[in-house]
């Protein structure tokens, strides 16, 4: 090293130094200016002129003295304008600059700098900028060389080029610096700790590029080199978007010229000098938080300023947000940052009693981001001056925004131990998580985080672990995850799966949190995290959820291609499909990423996907999935990505855990924006089991009551005895929380909550407490009512800083460049409430008294918000600031002034609202780009774009440039100021081409663009308008940055359409109950009066129409008793109404009138068609049955089926025109009357078109399927003795699908079940008659769905009426009336209709919507709107049925004429979007024309877990087979209800269907016989069962299992069964030997409802035991067990865990996985005194001698798990080989051998496995 240094010194030139006793005098000019790079636009900057004297003291030291300081600023068009002096407030700063400063100088390099302590850092930094010009590293005989050189900006890459001058003693040196290539760069950041650098993004586009060029002229003197002149130019270029889209620059220049060298005596030395460091720039300690580019705080009385700003905020934000409120709030924040804790505490003590001031102070303290804010918070909490709500808000906000320093971390630690926080759990969680985030921000820019900062979190983790407090462990792990430091890895590893004593030492929840805590650590040390999580993923013995979570962390750490390929190779033989599906889906989605951040991972995953192939791509949504989608825009260099993780549970469709994350990329950085997560493992069990457990008959059993009895205790103890007999039993840890969720912001967890038993108990306690304190609740209600009567005034304001991002780095002149983004906002909500009551309320008022009165509430409310975003690029110092600034302001506000009336007794609600009476701006957005200069004398600003500029006039006129809302700028017109300083680089330096470009730009005028669009509302006599005005810099360059630079104003406003207010108020009235009809009749009477008034001028007479309306409305208002009294016996109300309407129709027809006007409720064309049809059908009305039969056959005779497909128009959605005769039975007449009334000719059609019904459209399919339906029903009736249990087993079976039949798409709708009868000729005719009548009723059902029918209104009272009315000054009716009718069909199923009409009597617009639910889960909905509900029509029909004998559901959407907008949307969806969606879903296509104007979707359940889908569009059919469902399709028994059965209500049926899906009712089955075993997961094993020993076949794995199924094989090879069911012990040997609690009970007694709570049914060969959800089928040779899917993963025993995990199928009671099946089966033997009698088998540790492979010595090896062996007095008659793990000890170790010989118990469980060998396990023993 020393040799290299000597060689370097040998090549160095003579030292550049200052000779002692000489003074070197220089003139120095420097400036820095910011703005757009093009000439002609306005820029802003700072400049300085001064004289410099350098006195040489020794060869290595000199003194610099500054004189004649002249500070200036620039504000105007560049380069034509000049600099102007800064005068006011700079005297003290200039005095500091003129203080002499000493510095070390050796071999051309600047060393340490010494200055008096009173000299500020800003002055010393300017001295550094001057000395930076003297930093030279020249080498002898080298003209070009590179090195890392120290400068003001840091230690950066520097290139030297040395050229000889014209004279012998002169040389020219050019030095360039790449400021983006630095070993140590000087910069400061704020608000970017959570942002991660994106190296690949920076390679594509460097957002901040910096470079500097220095030109030197040097004299070569014998005494050394002297700098004659030096010029520097530095460019800082910021590209917000892609570099081609424009950039903003900061240009800095320095000029140093030698004026002379004189001899002078040595200068006097300062009394005390302090070492201020080297040449690199030094930021003040609080510069990042206290140096704001927006405000100048130096020299101000800050306490007075704070009071002034607070007063402005309080007084001007009472009703709505003031437009300057966000800026004022930022000013308040800036002032508070510059005061100490004492001043802040003084302000609080003065104002905290005033609630308005209190709110603003508490909002501003978190935005301070200084340690004084934490100190203030600590003192305020200690004095308990905050409420819990205020404390939670301010603690979270303060810790989230806090600038991380050692001082703030110390205060935060003290904050955690305050009693106020410790005693509030929610607040404590917030504080602990916030402390972890604060540590993360502090250590973000350090190599290693100090241990003392993490010690509080490590202590919390250790202490909670010692106490086994799971909640505290989770909190500590989450806080360490927020901190994200590699120092915590060892602490976290203890809780990772596979790292402790066993895999299940901690609960799954704790292990999952430990894995996820590594996510932030992976950002700092990805390789270490990969080494930890990869073994977890590869370990198949670990639970699938934990392996999946490790995979999430693994891919977030951005692994290499090699590691991803390793995962892919392991995935080829992955036995766990949940893990395989998740990892494959994650790699597949990542491989499609186009975001540069994921470029390397995407390439690695693309290779891995090719290795795996498409085998795993066929796994459906039943399995866990990961989805990653992203987008990236190259122009803006910004993107967004989203991740969705779903970890499925084998126990049902509800996932075990879900998480979603949104991540953003921009400016070369990436950050997690927000993340939500939910874990709900216990939620499905809660939904399935409910609050009470059901016995075999559905009766609720109270388990606690049973356990209180002595008999129950004895049997519970019996269960525990059985558990103790199992070797090393460990109950599976219960997942205590039912659900838990969390929210992360910027990768930091800010809040998490859990719903567990404790939380449920708290909620229950609060509920019971509220009920028990009923009097207190009534008192609170009375207090609120009293306040409302007096009038309540509520004001809520909130000020906030959304984002504050700053980046500061020095420029060459020694002042910092500041990039700043600030987003702040203020919201105000104010409401004035005043209530009045129709009657005075009693003093002891109750809620019932309040509801019995008519309440009138007057409301005057306003809500408003204003948001202010500021982006700055400029220069900032304590005194002066200059730069370019863009403001974006948005304000929105809305006021409400109205009245609410409510009468609960009469079910009436009415609200009125006053409309806008004048122009009201709702949303206002402005954007302004300016250049500014701020100093203590004021603020000067100019727009970036001058209105017009020429070269002849050097300056923009004051009238054009001066802003109207700022202080008076410096007078540019003063000639002496203009001539004070002229640029040394004048315009003659530009080439002619450059001057022409300058002239073109400066003489151009930016264009003002305007745009306005309004949408008028005639109903409200107002219009909503959007207007915009834009003036940008796109005329200079067509780039994105220039398009958003300039001035922009847009607003959304509401304005009345006329000067006179036509609408006085808008009313909304809702009436329900019996009074609803009154609202309808009032509206109709108005229409009737208007129609009578217009009769005189109308050519169309309407005789009898008004009388008909009034008679119908009177009938509506008549009571139900009157209608029942008038109703003849045996007739229905519908028939009487039908006949009434029919007679009315005929009388109207006889009058010979023309079609009535469109506002009436009767259509005469329908009546004529009905009359004509009745006359045509009267000849064939001999009997109702024949008439009905003929009616059903008529469509086929007249070619109706052909017209179904040949029609070229819209399908007719109404009934058939061939209705049955009016002389039929009452139901028939009702049907025909309904049809005749509803058959309305649409207004847009000229010629009537034959109608079709849904029954006729599928008549061929129906007839072809009727025979198969009847045959299937007959076969089912012949085997009616089979139980419902067998039906469910048939449903579980997987049937083969006939592929050719599937492509026919023959869907058979569900039919009514036929009554079982003998098939005789008579019955056959009867059957046909029934079929025809069924068809007729089907047609009638279709006719009910015609939207134009009015029969519903005639037969039913309206249930709800909603009237939206505009009260006009001219008294005209304007608004909308909506009427809701609902009732029940003849089958007791719901039907409903909604009718909406306009209130204007001149309007014919109407909307009709009908809904009906028919039997067998068939629903129809139709809607029509427009002219008399007939202009536009659509219908939806949903039904259940069969597709090739598989249960299916079908949804049909039909439409007629549609509005043009809907028509375009429909065409775009069907023709453009549908093929794309089908292609993404990989659906097959069949070019097949289907019905026009109809879309059909058929879903068929081929198996309980697989579904086929068919989508029929008018021109094509899409289908897909074998779609794997995440849930189990409900059993067909759900809709196979007999017609006459007592079915549940509709809500109960829907709840049952949903419950069937959520509960996933497909049971898991396990079967065992004497030779083999098939587990719940379907694994098959051959097993030679030991005799006379009980095996645990199946049980629920918990500390108190509700059931245990035990089996035993006797000496005759017969199986006996024993069950322990909660409080019962059942033993079954045969059908004649059944014992309950030792008492023999006959089978017939157990086959019916009994006191034991279970059933035993005789199923022929088998006995079937039913207990709750458990089913056990038994005979002497085999046993079958069915458990519900709610026990997925919660069973154990020989039948396995029931978790679909075949690799871990052989889990023993100690949760270890057995080496072979025999060892697994033997581990579940419960040996007792009956296990072999005197020669009973028992578990014994076996011994084997072995020789050590390494040392060759003898060892004694013992089995780690005992195996089945006979006693020493007996010998084995049968044995089987088993694999045994051995633990070996030296031969001289005799402790275990002695224990074995003495028969003392010992265990080697958990010891290391040194040897695995095969040994004999005994099966039976003989004496």
Swiss-Prot record:
Region (Disordered): 953-986, 1119-1289, 1308-1351
VWFD domain boundaries: 1564-1732
PTM (free text): What corresponds to phosvitin in other species is lost during maturation of vitellogenin to lipovitellin.
Glycosylation sites: 1097, 1298, 1675
InterPro entries, A to Z: Lipid_transp_b-sht_shell, Lipovitellin_superhlx_dom, Vitellinogen_b-sht_N, Vitellinogen_b-sht_shell, Vitellinogen_b-sht_shell_sf, Vitellinogen_open_b-sht, Vitellinogen_open_b-sht_sub1, Vitellogenin/Apolipophorin
Gene3D superfamilies associated with the record: Lipovitellin, beta-sheet shell regions, chain A, Lipovitellin-phosvitin complex, chain A, domain 4, Lipovitellin. Chain A, domain 3, Vitellinogen, beta-sheet shell domain, Vitellinogen, superhelical
Protein name, UniProt field: Vitellogenin
């Amino acid at each position: 090293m020393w040799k290299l240094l000597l060689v370097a010194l040998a090549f160095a030139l003579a030292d550049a130094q200052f000779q002692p006793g000489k003074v070197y005098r220089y003139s120095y000019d420097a400036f820095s200016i910011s703005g757009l790079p093009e000439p002609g636009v306005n820029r802003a900057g700072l400049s300085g002129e001064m004289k410099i004297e350098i006195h040489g003291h020794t060869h290595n030291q000199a003194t610099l003295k500054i004189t004649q300081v002249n500070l200036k600023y620039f504000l105007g068009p560049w380069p034509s304008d000049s600099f102007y002096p800064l005068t006011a407030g700079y005297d003290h700063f200039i005095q500091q600059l003129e203080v002499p400063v000493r510095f070390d100088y050796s071999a051309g390099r600047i060393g340490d700098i010494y200055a008096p302590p009173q000299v500020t850092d800003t002055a010393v930094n300017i001295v550094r900028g001057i000395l930076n010009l003297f930093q030279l590293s020249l080498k002898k005989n080298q003209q070009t060389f590179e090195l890392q050189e120290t400068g003001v900006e840091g230690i950066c890459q520097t290139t030297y080029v040395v050229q000889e001058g014209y004279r012998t003693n002169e040389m020219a040196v050019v030095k360039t610096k790449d400021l983006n290539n630095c070993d140590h760069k000087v910069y400061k950041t704020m608000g970017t700790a959570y942002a991660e650098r994106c190296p690949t993004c920076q390679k594509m586009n460097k957002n901040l590029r910096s470079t500097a060029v220095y030109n030197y002229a040097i004299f070569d003197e014998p005494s050394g080199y002297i700098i004659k002149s030096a010029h520097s130019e530095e460019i800082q270029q910021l590209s917000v978007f892609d570099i081609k889209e424009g950039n903003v620059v900061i240009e800095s220049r320095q000029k140093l010229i030698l004026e002379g060298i004189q001899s002078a005596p040595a200068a006097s030395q300062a009394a005390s000098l302090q070492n201020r460091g080297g040449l690199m720039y030094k930021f003040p300690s609080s510069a990042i938080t206290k140096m704001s580019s927006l405000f100048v705080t130096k020299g101000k009385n800050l306490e007075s300023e704070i009071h002034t700003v607070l007063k402005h905020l309080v007084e001007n934000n009472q009703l709505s947000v003031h437009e300057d409120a966000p800026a004022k709030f930022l000013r308040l924040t800036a002032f508070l940052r510059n005061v100490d804790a004492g001043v802040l505490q003084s302000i609080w003590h003065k104002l905290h009693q005033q609630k308005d001031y209190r709110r603003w102070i508490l909002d501003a303290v978190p935005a301070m981001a200084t340690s004084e804010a934490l100190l203030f918070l600590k003192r305020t909490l200690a004095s308990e001056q905050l409420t819990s709500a205020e404390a939670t808000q301010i603690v979270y906000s303060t810790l989230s925004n806090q600038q991380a320093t050692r001082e703030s971390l110390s205060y935060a630690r003290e904050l955690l131990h305050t009693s106020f926080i410790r005693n509030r759990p929610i607040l404590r969680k917030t504080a602990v998580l916030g402390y972890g985030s604060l540590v993360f921000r502090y250590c973000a820019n350090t190599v290693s985080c100090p241990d003392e900062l993490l010690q509080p979190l490590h202590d919390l983790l250790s202490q909670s672990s010692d106490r086994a407090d799971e909640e505290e462990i989770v909190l500590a792990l989450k806080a360490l995850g927020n901190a994200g430091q590699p120092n915590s890895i060892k602490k976290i590893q203890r809780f990772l799966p596979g790292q402790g004593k066993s895999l299940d030492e901690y609960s799954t929840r704790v292990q999952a949190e430990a894995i996820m805590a590594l996510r932030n650590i992976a950002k700092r040390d990805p390789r270490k995290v990969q080494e930890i999580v990869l073994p977890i993923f590869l370990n198949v013995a670990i639970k699938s959820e934990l392996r999946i979570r490790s995979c999430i962390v693994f891919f977030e750490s951005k692994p290499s291609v090699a590691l991803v390929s390793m995962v892919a190779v392991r995935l080829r033989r992955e036995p766990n499909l949940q893990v395989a599906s998740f990892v494959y889906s994650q790699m597949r989605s990542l491989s499609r990423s186009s975001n540069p951040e994921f470029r390397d991972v995407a390439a690695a995953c693309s290779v891995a996907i090719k290795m795996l192939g498409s085998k795993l791509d066929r796994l459906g949504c039943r399995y866990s999935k990961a989805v990653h989608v992203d987008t990236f825009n190259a122009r803006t260099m910004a993107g967004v990505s989203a991740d969705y993780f779903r970890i499925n549970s084998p126990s049902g469709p509800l996932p075990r855990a879900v998480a979603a994350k949104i991540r953003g990329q921009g400016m070369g950085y990436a950050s997690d924006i927000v993340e939500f997560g939910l874990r709900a493992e216990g939620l499905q069990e809660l939904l399935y089991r409910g609050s009470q457990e059901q016995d075999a008959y559905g009766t609720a059993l109270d388990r606690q009551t049973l356990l209180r009895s002595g008999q129950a205790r004895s049997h519970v103890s019996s269960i525990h005895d059985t558990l103790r007999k199992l070797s090393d039993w460990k109950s599976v840890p219960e997942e205590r929380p039912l659900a838990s969720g969390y929210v992360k912001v910027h990768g930091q967890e800010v809040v998490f909550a859990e719903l567990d038993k404790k939380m449920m108990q708290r909620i229950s306690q609060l509920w019971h407490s509220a009920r028990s304190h009923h009097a207190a609740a009534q008192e609170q209600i009375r207090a609120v009512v009293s306040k409302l009567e007096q009038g309540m005034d509520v004001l809520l304001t909130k000020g906030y800083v959304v984002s504050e991002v700053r980046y500061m780095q020095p420029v060459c002149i020694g002042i910092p460049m500041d990039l700043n983004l600030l987003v702040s906002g203020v919201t105000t909500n104010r409401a004035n409430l005043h209530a009045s009551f129709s009657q005075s309320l009693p003093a002891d008022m109750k809620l019932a008294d309040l509801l019995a009165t008519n309440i009138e509430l007057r409301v005057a409310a306003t809500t408003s918000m204003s948001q202010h975003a500021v982006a700055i690029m400029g220069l900032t110092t304590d005194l002066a600031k200059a730069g370019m600034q863009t403001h974006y302001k948005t304000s929105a506000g809305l006021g409400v002034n109205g009245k609410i009336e409510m009468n609960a007794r009469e079910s009436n609600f009415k609200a009125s609202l006053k409309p806008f009476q004048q122009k009201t701006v709702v949303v206002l957005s402005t954007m302004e780009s300016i250049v500014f200069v701020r100093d203590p004398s004021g603020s000067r600003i100019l727009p970036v774009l001058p209105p017009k500029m020429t070269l002849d006039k050097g300056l923009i006129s004051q009238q054009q440039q001066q802003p109207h809302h700022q202080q008076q700028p410096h007078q540019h017109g003063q000639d002496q100021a203009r001539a004070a300083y002229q640029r040394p680089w004048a315009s003659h330096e530009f080439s002619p081409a450059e001057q022409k470009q300058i002239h073109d730009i400066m003489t151009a005028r930016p264009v003002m663009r305007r745009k306005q669009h309004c949408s008028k509302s005639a109903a409200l006599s107002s219009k909503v308008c959007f207007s915009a005005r834009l003036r940008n810099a796109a005329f200079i360059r067509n780039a994105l940055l220039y398009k958003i630079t300039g001035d922009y104003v847009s607003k959304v406003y509401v304005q009345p359409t006329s000067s006179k207010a036509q609408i006085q108020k808008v009313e909304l009235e809702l009436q329900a109950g019996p009074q609803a009809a009154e609202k309808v009749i009032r509206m109709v009477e108005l229409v009737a009066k208007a129609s009578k008034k217009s009769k005189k001028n109308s050519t169309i007479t309407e005789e009898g129409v008004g009388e008909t309306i009034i008679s119908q409305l009177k009938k509506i208002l008549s009571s139900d008793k009157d209608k029942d009294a008038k109703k003849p016996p045996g007739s229905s109300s519908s028939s009487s109404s039908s006949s009434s309407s029919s007679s009315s129709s005929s009388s109207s027809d006889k009058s010979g009138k023309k079609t009535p006007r469109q506002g009436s409720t009767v259509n005469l064309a329908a009546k004529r068609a009905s009359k004509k049809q009745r006359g045509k059908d009267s000849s064939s009305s001999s009997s109702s049955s024949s008439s009905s039969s003929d009616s059903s056959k008529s469509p086929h005779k007249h070619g109706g089926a052909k017209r179904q497909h040949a029609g070229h128009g819209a399908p007719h959605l109404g009934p058939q025109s061939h209705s049955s005769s009016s002389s039929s039975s009452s139901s028939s007449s009702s049907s025909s009357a309904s049809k005749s009334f509803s058959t309305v000719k649409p207004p847009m059609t000229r010629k009537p078109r034959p109608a079709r019904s849904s029954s006729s459209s599928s008549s061929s399919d129906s007839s072809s399927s009727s025979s198969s339906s009847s045959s299937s029903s007959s076969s089912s009736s012949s085997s009616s003795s089979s139980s419902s249990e067998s039906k469910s087993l048939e449903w579980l079976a997987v049937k083969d699908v006939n592929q050719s039949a599937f492509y026919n798409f023959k869907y058979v709708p569900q039919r009514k079940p036929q009554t079982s009868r003998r098939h005789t000729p008579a019955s056959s005719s009867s059957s046909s008659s029934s079929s025809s009548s069924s068809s007729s009723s089907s047609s009638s059902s279709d006719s009910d769905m015609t939207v134009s029918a009015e029969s519903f209104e005639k037969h039913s009272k309206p249930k709800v009426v909603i009237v939206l009315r505009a009260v006009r000054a001219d008294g005209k009716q304007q608004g909308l009336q909506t009427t809701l009718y609902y009732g029940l069909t003849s089958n007791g199923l719901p039907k409903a209709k909604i009718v909406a009409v306009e209130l204007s009597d001149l309007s014919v617009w109407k909307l009709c919507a009908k809904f009906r639910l028919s039997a067998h889960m068939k629903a129809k909905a139709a809607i029509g709107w427009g002219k008399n509900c007939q202009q536009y029509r659509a219908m939806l029909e949903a039904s259940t049925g069969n597709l090739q004998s598989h249960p299916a559901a079908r949804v049909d959407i039909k439409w007629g004429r549609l509005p043009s907008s809907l028509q375009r949307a429909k065409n775009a969806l069907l023709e453009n979007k549908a093929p794309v969606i089908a292609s993404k879903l990989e659906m097959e296509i069949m070019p097949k024309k289907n019905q026009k104007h109809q879309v059909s979707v058929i879903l068929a359940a081929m198996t309980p877990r697989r579904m086929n889908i068919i989508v029929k569009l008018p021109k094509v059919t899409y289908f897909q087979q074998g779609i794997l469902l995440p849930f189990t399709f409900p059993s067909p028994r759900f809709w196979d209800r007999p017609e006459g059965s007592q079915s549940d209500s509709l809500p109960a049926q829907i709840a049952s269907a949903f419950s069937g899906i959520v509960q996933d009712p497909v049971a898991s089955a396990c079967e065992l016989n004497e030779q083999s075993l098939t587990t719940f997961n379907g694994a098959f094993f051959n097993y030679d069962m030991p005799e006379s020993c009980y095996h645990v076949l199946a049980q629920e794995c918990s500390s108190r299992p509700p059931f245990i199924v035990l089996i035993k094989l006797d000496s005759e090879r017969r199986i006996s069964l024993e069950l322990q069911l909660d409080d019962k012990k059942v033993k079954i040997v045969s059908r004649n030997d059944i014992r309950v609690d030792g008492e023999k009970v006959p089978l017939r007694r157990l086959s019916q409802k009994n006191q034991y709570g279970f059933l035993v049914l005789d199923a022929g060969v088998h006995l079937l035991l039913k207990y709750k959800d458990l089913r056990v089928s038994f005979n002497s040779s085999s046993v079958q067990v069915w458990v519900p899917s709610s026990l997925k993963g919660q069973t154990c025993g020989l039948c396995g865990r029931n978790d679909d995990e075949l690799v871990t199928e052989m889990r023993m009671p100690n949760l270890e996985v057995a080496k072979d099946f025999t060892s697994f089966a033997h581990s579940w033997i419960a040996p007792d005194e009956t296990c072999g009698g005197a020669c009973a088998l028992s578990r014994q540790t076996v011994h084997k001698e072995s020789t050590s492979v390494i040392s060759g010595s003898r060892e004694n090896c013992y089995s780690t798990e005992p195996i089945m062996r006979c006693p020493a007095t007996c010998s084995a008659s049968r044995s089987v080989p088993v694999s045994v793990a051995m633990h070996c000890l030296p031969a001289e170790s005799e402790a275990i051998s002695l224990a074995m010989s003495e028969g003392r118990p010992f265990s080697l469980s958990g010891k290391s496995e040194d040897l695995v060998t095969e040994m004999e396990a005994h099966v039976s023993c003989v004496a």
